[in-house]
Curated annotation (Swiss-Prot):
Mg(2+) binds at E360. SUPFAM superfamilies: DNase I-like, L domain-like. Its EC number is 3.1.13.4. This is CCR4-Not complex 3'-5'-exoribonuclease subunit Ccr4. It catalyses: Exonucleolytic cleavage of poly(A) to 5'-AMP. The keyword Nuclease applies. Acts as a catalytic component of the CCR4-NOT core complex, which in the nucleus seems to be a general transcription factor, and in the cytoplasm the major mRNA deadenylase involved in mRNA turnover. Ccr4 has 3'-5' RNase activity with a strong preference for polyadenylated substrates and also low exonuclease activity towards single-stranded DNA. Residues 30-82, 134-153 are annotated as: Disordered. It comes from Emericella nidulans (strain FGSC A4 / ATCC 38163 / CBS 112.46 / NRRL 194 / M139) (Aspergillus nidulans). It is found in: Cytoplasm; Nucleus. One of its GO terms (biological process) is nuclear-transcribed mRNA poly(A) tail shortening.
Length: 675
């Protein structure tokens, strides 16, 4: 907001021209709003969307302006000219175009320098503002009335800039470093070009470029997915970039006073902003695909290793979750399951890993598509749906998602398979009695993990493959932590059982026949033996919905967590909360070797690392990784899914080599020997 003197200035634009910075807090808004057509409701995005910052919002055509400007009629324009708006209204008599004309008239009224900043200053005049000087401090904390208070964290106090009416011909690059901006007024200037760096201001909700000399908009305008108002009145714009179809929250597109091509103008006149944005989104051509993700070689000697394995993990975004309400920026074709499943299948075949772990695959898609299609590429599969499928009619159960694990049938023998239902496992624990949080918070979540126990046909090495999907909601950190603890506890139990698993005695029955005929295979090695469960190579893949540094992440990486961890919020989960949580495995994230990826989940409102391939570092080491998505490509793509990335998550792929000798050293028995 304004400083108390309203005189703060920065020099960042147009060769040193000064400007005032301002923002307006909601408590300073008056309620005598100028009459305005009702706004369309905000679009509700995906469940990962963070809370919107509404504490500094104001409407361009109401609020401060209602009390700061004289009343005017739409037919009166400040420059002294008159337009017969009534005649134009008679032609359409449409609320959408009537709103366009009203807002255009208001925009033309606002041509004086810093019009909007001055309006806010006028409105807030006389309002008492709390002193900005901090209270006396002692050792970094505030002391008042004998009460010690933690020093509040600093925050950005202003979120809007008004450069209106300054005669600007260019914008300095430093402007686009103000990524916190929510409102930017650049109206009534002489701008001929809007730099593509505008896409960096992704928090903008209001952008006013009216009364300039613009002839086009950059593709990067589509990155501003939080925009509610985009005002382009009185420019020379003839067409709009298809990337504006990404602006699914846009409520007002001010386009009157531009020589816009007929098809676009007709659409916005008759059906309004939402219809035009939807048209641009659906008609958006398929862009040039990004460069292939680099393959990062971490150990060149592994190329000749006789015992290596590649593992892929991928949350594919279940069909029932891929809706316009969650992914309003994506064209309907992009969200269609028929398109996405083919794109996913092609990606899996292109990578051709030894092991595939998929999350959010529904039962119907597994049985009727992926299992059959991947069988042509030598894969066998194991699938379990989430717990809600139990008791459902068969047809209804087809739509329930779960975890699917595929492995190369010519390379591995399936020794065992298990499912872990976190909620059901928790309530069966002896210490669950009387623990209400287990029933009220954990048991209701039906997320699962699937375990498969494999043996390499040729080398005899054995592997435990875990495919997990944890609960998503950040408000349930305790649930994610307990799900992780139960996961590690169950893996520990199964690994000890697998350490005693008998060897395969007749591998001849598993000889692999190539399509073109019988292939001569080397004699298979005997099954490896392991002294304990933590000596068996372990890969734990999935969507853990937990960022690096979270409690769930630290439990896996560090082997344990203290009792009564803060993330539990003093909730009671039996011994897991009373005693603490431990596991015996020495696990590392495969991508930890390069400091993790920039993200594994990418949407306009959420970009973070949620997916991992964990491995037991005492048994295998990482030799290669699939790298980042091209950063230049991401400058014009606000979120996934899109035509090239069929899920809001990206695939992870890592290659490993088994370390040294495996398990027990079995001495050969040559029978009685002569001295």
């Amino acid at each position: 907001m304004y400083s108390q003197t309203h005189q703060q200035q920065h020099v960042i634009m147009n060769g040193g021209q000064a400007h005032q910075r301002f923002g307006m807090q909601m408590k300073f808004q008056t309620q005598n709003h100028h009459p305005h057509p009702a706004q369309q409701p905000h679009h509700h995005a995906h469940h990962n969307q963070p809370p919107q910052h509404v504490g500094h919002q104001h409407n361009f055509s109401s609020g401060a302006l209602a009390s700061a400007t004289p009343h005017f009629t739409p037919s009166h324009i400040q420059n002294g000219t008159h337009t017969n708006i009534d005649e134009e209204l008679d032609e359409s008599m449409n609320e959408h175009w009537q709103q366009q004309l009203q807002l255009a008239a208001e925009s033309r009224q606002a041509s004086s320098p810093h019009y909007y900043a001055r309006a806010v200053a006028q409105q807030t005049k006389g309002i008492q503002i709390a002193p900005s000087q901090p209270e006396a401090q002692e050792n970094g904390v505030n002391q008042k009335n004998g009460i010690t208070k933690t020093k509040p964290a600093s925050r950005q106090g202003w979120h809007a800039l008004d450069f209106g009416g300054q005669g600007l011909r260019a914008l300095a690059p430093s402007l686009f470093k103000y990524a916190f901006l929510e409102k930017l007024y650049l109206s009534h200037n002489k701008l001929k070009v809007l730099p593509p760096q505008i896409g960096q201001l992704r928090k903008l909700t209001h952008l006013d470029l009216s009364a300039n000399d613009l002839t086009e908009l950059p593709e990067e305008i589509g990155m501003l997915t939080n925009l509610r108002h985009l005002l382009l009145f009185d420019n020379n714009i003839r067409t709009l970039p298809y990337e504006m179809g990404y602006l699914y929250r846009l409520e007002i597109l001010g386009i009157e006073g531009n020589p816009l091509e007929d098809v676009l103008k007709s659409l916005i006149m008759k059906e309004g902003t939402k219809a035009l944005i939807r048209y641009l989104k659906e008609e958006m051509p398929v862009h040039v695909p990004p460069p292939a993700r680099d393959w990062l070689v971490l150990d060149e000697t592994a190329a000749t290793s006789p015992d290596k394995v590649s593992v892929l993990s991928y949350n594919t975004l279940c069909d029932s979750s891929a809706t316009q309400s969650h992914y309003g920026y994506a064209p309907s074709r992009v969200l269609s399951w028929e398109f996405r499943r083919e794109t996913i299948l092609n990606e899996l075949r292109a990578h051709d890993p030894d092991i595939i772990c998929l999350q959010e695959i529904d039962q119907g898609s597994y049985n009727e598509f992926f299992r059959e299609q991947l069988a042509y590429s030598d894969y066998k599969g194991v699938f379990w749906p989430r717990g809600r499928a139990m008791g459902m009619q068969e047809e209804d159960a087809k739509g329930v998602d779960g975890c699917a694990t595929f492995f190369k049938g010519s390379k591995f023998i399936l020794l065992d398979k298990q499912v872990i239902n976190f909620g059901q496992t928790a309530v069966r624990r002896p210490d669950a009695k009387g623990q209400d949080d287990i029933y009220n918070r954990l048991w209701q979540k039906d997320h699962i993990a699937v375990i498969v126990f494999l043996e390499n046909r040729q080398t005899g090495s054995r592997f435990i493959i875990v495919n997990a999907h944890l609960y998503w909601d950040p408000a349930f950190k305790d649930v994610k932590l307990i799900q992780t603890a139960i996961l590690m506890e169950e893996i520990t139990k199964h690994s000890e059982k697998y350490a005693k698993w008998p060897p395969c005695t007749d591998k001849a029955a598993f000889r692999f026949r190539e399509a073109q005929g019988e292939q001569t295979m080397p004699e298979p090695a005997p099954s490896a033996e392991y002294a304990s469960g933590d000596q068996i190579p372990l890969f734990m893949c999935g969507d853990f919905n937990s960022s690096p540094g979270s409690a769930a992440y630290n439990l896996i990486a560090n082997g344990g967590l203290i009792e009564e961890h803060p993330d539990l919020e003093k909730r009671m989960y039996g011994n897991l909360s009373k005693v603490g949580m431990t596991h015996p495995f020495k696990l590392k994230s495969a991508y930890g070797a390069i400091g993790e990826l920039s993200f594994t989940n990418y949407t306009p409102d959420f970009k973070d690392i949620l997916d991992y391939i964990w491995y037991s570092s005492n048994t295998v080491h990482v030799s290669g990784l699939l790298g980042e998505v091209d950063k230049d490509y991401l400058q014009r793509v606000p979120g996934f899914p899109n035509y090239h990335f069929p899920s809001d998550h990206i695939a992870l792929l890592a290659e490993f080599s088994v370390k040294g000798k495996k398990g027990k050293v079995v001495e050969a028995d040559f029978g009685p020997q002569r001295n």
